[in-house]
Amino acid sequence: MARTNTIRPRWRHYTTNRGDSPVREFLDALPADDAAKVVVAMRQIRENGLQAARHLRGDLYEVRVPVSDQGIRVLFAPQGKRSTVLLALVAYSKKSQQAPARFIDLAESRLRDWNGRGAARPQRRSVTTYNGATL
């Protein structure tokens, strides 16, 4: 059997010019059980590809995570050669089915900012943890 060299994508988080990471801050503030559910959903996308996510528009995709009476959403964009980076741009809680336009617009704005600053350059690999749940 031939062995294939499949590169598994890794998650990165949008950071502002000041180094703030709004997605990480949102996810760190979640209760541990909810953070664990988000990590499981993000792992599924990393392992199974974009078909495990919902396409929104352009380069944007959505991770949907059902928690308690609402849902957590993480908007992200694949980046790099062969989409080897999944860039988390926006995370929020919601109750409606459709992603609010303001969050999609914010994700697109952050993606333009990220690419405009050249922030997509490779970084050292690290373990990502949210409130005790490891991605």
Model-derived features: positions:
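Basic, Lys/Arg-enriched alpha-helical interface segments
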Residues: 1-71, 80-86, 92-135
